[in-house]
């Protein structure tokens, strides 16, 4: 959409926002601050350990989650796999921003936040599209047209919850039972049967994959 500058910019005639490269972030809420404070007693960060990399990465604007991989390509190598602040796949711009902060040339010379001798590589996850098929029974006065937006919102919220928890899990699993429960929570839905994910059962992802919702087919 159109962008209106707050202050006068010489030579600017029009500006449009085409896509988001790095998401803005809301102020930290009280519960998040409390959890972060409690976690600070469980692990101690010092230069170059996993906790230090974790905390410094999350301190960079636009980063929502990170997994730190030590010695991923031999001694002295570190990989930071990140999500953006809405827990999606990071853009190239965000990856480059984090890379410049830690180790601009990936050579371990200590030109960024990483200690000398730590060659850091920043990467992001792969997205796995999950297509869903389900047969849904509706209550009197409801049908697909009236329930479809709420159904797909409920499924999206489940997927968003999985992505938000990615940092804390060794791998994510998209479960039929959880999708059925999300659908059943929609007003007007009385039953859901025969649910499949990508034509089969639960979808088990690798450690560095996150799910995104594909096509929902209604039986």
Enumerate the predicted regions with their spans.
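Glycine-centered loop/turn motifs
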Residues: 1-7, 117, 205-213
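Catalytic P-loop NTP-binding/switch module of NTPases
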Residues: 1-42, 99
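Surface-exposed loop/turn and secondary-structure junction residues enriched for glycine/proline
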Residues: 7-9, 44, 125, 133, ...
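Generic structural motif
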Residues: 12-19, 66, 192-195
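Noncatalytic linker/hinge segments flanking ATPase motor cores
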Residues: 25-28, 110-112, 173-181
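Intrinsically disordered, low-complexity, polar/charged repeat-rich segments
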Residues: 29-32, 36, 40-45, 131, ...
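Carbohydrate-recognition loop of C-type lectin domains
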Residues: 42-172
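An aromatic-glycine-centered, glycine-rich loop/turn in mixed alpha/beta architecture
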Residues: 147-219
């Amino acid at each position: 959409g159109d962008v209106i500058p707050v202050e006068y910019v010489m030579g600017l005639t029009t500006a449009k926002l085409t896509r988001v490269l790095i998401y803005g972030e809301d102020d930290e809420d009280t519960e998040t601050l409390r959890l972060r404070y409690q976690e600070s007693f469980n692990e101690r960060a010092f230069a170059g350990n996993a906790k230090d990399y974790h905390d410094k990465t999350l301190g960079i604007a636009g980063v929502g989650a990170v997994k730190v991989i030590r010695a991923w390509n031999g001694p002295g190598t570190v990989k930071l796999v990140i999500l953006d602040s809405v827990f999606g796949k990071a853009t190239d711009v965000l990856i480059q921003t984090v890379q410049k902060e830690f180790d601009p040339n990936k050579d371990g010379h200590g030109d960024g936040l990483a200690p000398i001798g730590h060659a850091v590589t920043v990467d992001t996850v792969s997205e796995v599209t999950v297509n869903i098929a389900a047969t849904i029974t509706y209550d009197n006065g409801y049908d697909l047209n009236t329930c479809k937006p709420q159904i797909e919102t409920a499924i999206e919220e489940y997927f968003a919850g999985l992505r938000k928890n990615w940092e804390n899990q060794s791998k994510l699993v998209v479960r039929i039972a959880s999708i059925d429960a999300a659908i059943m929570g929609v007003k007007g839905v009385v039953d859901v049967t025969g649910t499949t994910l990508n034509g089969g059962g639960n979808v088990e992802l690798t450690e560095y994959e996150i799910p995104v919702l594909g096509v929902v087919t209604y039986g």
